[in-house]
Amino acid sequence: MQGTKNNIYTVSRLNGEVRQILEGQLGKIWLNGEISNFSSPSSGHWYLTLKDHSSQIRCAMFKGRNQTVSFKPINGQQVLVKGAISVYEPRGDYQLLIESMLPAGDGLLAQQFDALKMKLAAEGLFAADTKRRLPKNIQRIGVITSPTGAAIRDVLHVLARRDPSIEVIIYPTQVQGETAAQSICQAINIANQRLEVDVLLLTRGGGSLEDLWCFNSEALAHTIYNSALPVVSAVGHEVDTTISDYVADIRAPTPSAGAELLSQDSDNKAQKLATALSRLQQSAKHYQLKQERRLSLLEHRLQRQDPKRTLQQFEQRFDEMQLRLESALSNRLHILSRRQQLLASRLEQQSPKHKLAIEGNRLSYLASRLQDALQDKLSQSEQRIKYVAHQLETVSPLATLSRGYSITTDIHNQVVDSTDKLTIGDSLQTRLRHGQVISTVTQIKPLE
């Protein structure tokens, strides 16, 4: 519908309506692809991308769902997943919310198994009111299995131990391979034509899903359903479940358990208990199938109002914010580390040790200059002293004496420079260049 000015969408409204359209129209789907960008944060949720040769889609599998997966996904692995398309509104991204995950090989078989189980359940082949009761006094048991397998040995051993009077008729058949389902159908039909036994025990030992696949045949399911003889299905181990288990009148978890179910002990309590338990299991499985269909319908109706979906989106957004926060913290720590290194370098340059080294070098330089300056000053002073000494020597009395003059002083060591200071009889000292002369004034002659 074209928008108008009176019908302007907000981004949130647009994403919300896109989510409702996608979730309402597609419902639950199966998807096959290769895993990439797998991550498993501390919340326990799984986030991944499924891709093929030309396209990819983001997926999320929340903790409550992925705990049922029997393997840890890895990048590059081919898987088959079941889920519902949703829109992560905060980003406007559409994604697949995964409910179950299987390896690609087993996954395709499991998908076919689920599809056939739903189809046959809808047709009423599993209905509890169609199940036949076992005869009260079983005399002959028809065993439909391989005559050379471990299952027939287990069955014969249990029957011989519990009730040797029971007669066993073996209807040999294949129990594995492409033609095994047809072979089993023929054996059941032969037993119904002969009507020589009281009950049929369909059995084989355990194996993989592929090994047991012949017991998941639609044709075999209808053959068991149409059998006039009651059928007990005892295929594989206790964890193995096949279509034949759902259609049969009673399901036993193992071949030995099937033999015990059909044989009586002294008080017959085991048979009664096993029969009641088997019927209870069948009723529970039928009820479970009915409730699964009802639950699927209710889930589809409640998708738009599912608070769990909203919570899951918040959890996914929280995981993304946590990853962004961890990245931001890492970048911040890197920046702080660089800044710390820079400050450490600057602190090293400002440290007393560094300054002392610089000042020590400067002091050595100044000491050298001071030494040179003192040497220059001493040299200049020496030259000055020599010059002054020379000048002093020039005017010194000693210099006068060296030129042939003498100096006369009285007894008081006063220089006599005039006869006015003398009287007859005064003692005089005359200083010559070399030595002194002591004399007495005997005559005074004034200057003419």
From Swiss-Prot:
UniProt catalytic activity: Exonucleolytic cleavage in either 5'- to 3'- or 3'- to 5'-direction to yield nucleoside 5'-phosphates
Membrane-traversing stretches: none
Subcellular location(s) of the protein: Cytoplasm
Enzyme Commission numbers on file: 3.1.11.6
GO-annotated biological processes: DNA catabolic process
GO cellular component: cytoplasm; exodeoxyribonuclease VII complex
Chief location: cytoplasm
Record carries keyword 4Fe-4S: no
Function: Bidirectionally degrades single-stranded DNA into large acid-insoluble oligonucleotides, which are then degraded further into small acid-soluble oligonucleotides.
Family assignment from sequence similarity: Belongs to the XseA family.
Quaternary state and interactors: Heterooligomer composed of large and small subunits.
PANTHER family (UniProt xref): EXODEOXYRIBONUCLEASE 7 LARGE SUBUNIT
Protein known as: Exodeoxyribonuclease 7 large subunit
Species this protein is from: Shewanella baltica (strain OS223)
